[in-house]
Swiss-Prot record:
Organism ancestry: Bacteria, Pseudomonadati, Pseudomonadota, Betaproteobacteria, Burkholderiales
Matches recorded under InterPro entries: CyaY, Frataxin/CyaY, Frataxin/CyaY_sf, Frataxin_CS
Residue stretches in coiled coil: none
Protein name: Iron-sulfur cluster assembly protein CyaY
GO cellular component terms, semicolon-separated: cytoplasm
Record has Iron as a keyword: yes
Similarity annotation: Belongs to the frataxin family.
GO molecular function terms listed in the Swiss-Prot or TrEMBL record: ferric iron binding
Role description: Involved in iron-sulfur (Fe-S) cluster assembly. May act as a regulator of Fe-S biogenesis.
Amino acid sequence: MTETEFLALVDQVLDSIESQADDWAAGLDVDIEATRSGNVLTLVFEDGTQVVVNAQAAMQELWVAARSGGFHYRYDGQHWNDTRGGPRLPDALSQICSEAAGVPVSVRL
């Protein structure tokens, strides 16, 4: 995948996550603020917990920084897979954001 293709894919992913965070705020009464700056999306929850999702174009990876640690994801043409064999990106973000929000939320990509 070219860098341009990768960045277009990342843009779609970050837009989707940001939109879903807005839906959680409206539909589930989750206190969350989503802020986007280029290829970095920061989610800030009521208790101050931050989750940062950012693109690493040179490595063609998405990185997630959360209280529980740092995670790297690579796209295989269908899924964003953890480079260390952990859960795929939507499952990991669902768990991380559910813990931060205090209610179950689901990330779909």
